[in-house]
């Protein structure tokens, strides 16, 4: 019986159809009651809504009782010009005015020749006759449904004007009125085309992966696997089960950059597969996918009205009858009083009558609201009602949840301990992870992943009686044990009256979770989380808008305060240890100060979201309940969209005020002109028409992008795999330029090697970190204009091989680091999501003077340079740059010079020369050394080099004694490349590491720790090719190019043969060219300077010419052993076109296998030679 009812319900739903109609006859809200009355009278119509600005009617009807064409026919009987809109259609049908308007206009124009030949004045009457039909038809339809509208008023005006023999005026009225209808339709189409394209994002067809059959998306069931080729739009929400690609989600979330997708990634209908072939297992029906829900929300929002709109609509009902009454009085009273010049009074009455249409006033609010809602939707913000847009413009306080809103919600398990002797750690972890598998909290997923990483497999099916206690924790029964997991408050649920005192680490914002087995505290765990990028920027923007910010979290106060510190103490109020009801209570208190918004993403936030004046829920990733409760939905996780939404709401409110004022002033102006003795009927019609158009065009300004103020930035071509690092949620104009800084050529354009396409650049500024000891100086010659205030993260996005990506912190694949014998313990410590991080990360700020040019002279830290050092006694400027020292500090030497910013020409005699003074504190007797750096003509930053901002230096420096030699190892600070490609992108230390060679003491001052912060593959591959002694890395590899097809390594030694690993970062592997993703410098061969045969080799000393080494020293060219040529090694394995998309992994695994084999073969050579 139940099954039968379900089947009947399904049939009933299938019979119901949603149809869209373009109704061109809608002028303003005065037509809405006419449409409603028509639709009410039709059998089979269940629901309907009218969107006035877009002239759209949406009808849900029984397809068996009434068809869309029958509904359109009923609307057209009232002369509403309705058409059924075909799915996905956004083209404008009426590209040209109606024939009535064209003929009427031509005849009116010819009638002006009456001054030459008077009988031609009758052409004006013909113009009236030619254009009056549409107006008459609409007026007749209005009379049938007794209602006075503008069409009836125009007919009365035309008849009266003709009666007074003002033929040209009557013709002008008819022509202006008929042409205005077309102009308004065209203007409103431009405003609505964006929204119509948004509504039809998802395709109507899908291809079944197994059979290749093309079917309607409505027929696709849940768990069906559909195929999506490159360039196609994803038809339905689902999970990728095969293949990988990049997806453009801009239309859905506002995300400007392509989002990489691989197996188990979620994809949404309406987003575009840019490259690659993927198979998607559907997770919802076509009508339930995110884009369909989004379209429904937008439709509901557009058909809703603000309070001001409802007030204007109510007033307009009385406005028109009142104007008709006034007009009648103006015409009749002078006749009764037998006033002279009755024609003037009749003209005046007609001007008043034509002013009786309040269309401009009525449209002033809905058009502005419509445009604002459209702009918000295309930016990844869904505002559920026009009223919420109005409220958002008045917001005074915004409160944020912490986990998943301010922070990423991507936790790392720092510690997991069992406190009970009879319960081992694995058993406890098994119970906890099994219960957590049933929770949707971000912490739960982290604990489940942690359990799997230590080979503990959770079994959620074994958990009984699962319960969730919002703000406290969760409960589940497994293996006969009652397991309670949560914060301190969960103790009371477990029946533990006194919480045992245990020492837990809450420093650094760690979140502590407690595990109770029955009434006994059995264990605890520590989790840490990081703030989202862009949050502090969003808070600063909200402050600049005069909005107070607050954080409300159920997490402990220490974690809350740590997040506040991470954000630079930008929040005004911070509350920790809150239950859901506590959040609601605090929101109530905030509301006393002014309208309050709450931003959250979880079940715990639902009560607070409902209590606030505006609830903003965090997007597609947010829980379903939060999305339902929120008044505004943030489709992405970028909090910077919130100040943007507030600005948009305030702009929309201003536009409404402007529109209302414009409408009233113009109407009042024409009436004042008429009463002042100039009653122009055609002018009154023109004002009526013009007001509507002005209101529409003024509102459409909301759809325009506001120009960003500031210098244009130089990017690589969008097709490059080496785009600048982009933080999560960054817009396309906010890009980390640290790795993307390139030179500018003399013609004011960035070089093509930097930008891909030449972008014009007037003011080119070098990015410079700020510090306490230095002010920001602009350095000419480098592209990029973003001045950073904080030391940048050490590693780029995408460095981890795991799914979860972080944009800051040290990142190395944990598995690769653990496997490598060369990486010391402190680099093997646990990082987040399988990433290594270094405990000894330090940032040093050092000062270098760039003013003086004479060797062996110390630069004074303050004041002018000594005479003769510079032209015109130019002021010495500090260059302060952070030196990142990873692992252990350098032995015995504090390096005080770093050539990150050598693009400085303002203080030297020659533009081709840069002087810097290095301070090496190896001993008291060491003199100050001055380094002369020559820069090539093409600009201060070398073109064609992926190693931005670094300049080669010779082995012997000016002012050095013969025994003292300095040099540098230059590592590429390049952006991330795709996934784990071996490339210059693997090198991540930001800047240059110096080494010093002291002959007298017969010792080499080198690093103790290799600076290997690469993706999993590169970490192993590069170390494979370098020698090792006693477990310490003595050399640092540097990939360089000798020819197009070779990548050279900078390891040294005659007997040591070092590796060359050439990988492609693009799908096409048959080309013989070495890709830019792999190589560092196309015109350079690194050589190694050996000081003495018996001494240890200092690797990485760069020698430009052989004469830099004395006769007893030899410059040895680096040869290659671990060579993987592209065509033979990779292309042969990837030649199958069906598997072409997996080419990169093929090449990578092959190279790794080959290189590892060679490494084992030559390992004893490495050891022997370096120990010599």
Swiss-Prot record:
GO terms for molecular function: ATP binding; ATP hydrolysis activity; metal ion binding; P-type cadmium transporter activity; P-type zinc transporter activity. GO terms for cellular component: plasma membrane; plasmodesma. Residues 17-83 form the HMA domain. The keyword Repeat does not apply. PROSITE patterns: ATPASE_E1_E2 (PS00154), HMA_2 (PS50846). The chain crosses the membrane at residues 94-115, 119-138, 146-166, 168-188, 315-337, 346-363, 657-676, 681-700. Mg(2+) binds at residues 601, 605. Its EC number is 7.2.2.12, 7.2.2.21. Keywords: ATP-binding, Cadmium, Magnesium, Membrane, Metal-binding, Nucleotide-binding, Translocase, Transmembrane, Transmembrane helix, Zinc. It is an enzyme of class 7 (translocase). It is a multi-pass membrane protein. PANTHER family: CADMIUM/ZINC-TRANSPORTING ATPASE HMA2-RELATED (PTHR48085), CADMIUM_ZINC-TRANSPORTING ATPASE HMA4-RELATED (PTHR48085:SF5). NCBIfam families: ATPase-IB2_Cd, ATPase-IB_hvy, ATPase_P-type. This is Putative cadmium/zinc-transporting ATPase HMA4. The lineage of its organism: Eukaryota, Viridiplantae, Streptophyta, Embryophyta, Tracheophyta.
